[in-house]
Amino acid sequence: MLLFDRDGEYWVILNKRTQKVEHHKGEICFPGGRKDMLDKDLTETALRETWEEMGVDPSNVSVLGILGKTETTTGYEITPTVGLISYPYQFNIHNDEVEEVIEMPLSCLFLKDTRRYEAKLLEGEVIVQPAFHYENNMIFGATARILNNFACLIDSRNLEEPA
């Protein structure tokens, strides 16, 4: 999870995936991917994947910490690493993987117009989970759960519960 400070407000970087990728085509996500055998830990994996997908030099990222694990419906386990980069940053995206870079203010995680709760049928059970709508993009699934967990760490008092 890449963050940056723009005029005293923190923003998060998200990617819109292309239609060329194998999984989660067109979905909004964080840069990231699978751990390689050469990666010494998951932080190194996050930095390597961010370099490969977005051209963000690992030396330009100040790692702030690691969030709790989140599972996807496709069986992946995500361990989000939070890092800070300077703004503006000149991204060099991998066009086969990233269609668009989305910059979203963290304040959107707390706004009624942005924050939703979506019901989804999963293996015969209705699951209600957070989703975020920002600039004609719907952020849902594991990405929305990670953002929601991060918002709770920032300030849970400003979050609304589902009706």
Show where each model-derived region lies.
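N-terminal strand-loop-strand
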Residues: 1-30
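Buried hydrophobic packing segments
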Residues: 2-3, 143, 147-150
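Unchanged
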Residues: 20, 34-135, 139, 149-163
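Gly/Ser/Thr-rich helix-start
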Residues: 27, 33-34, 142
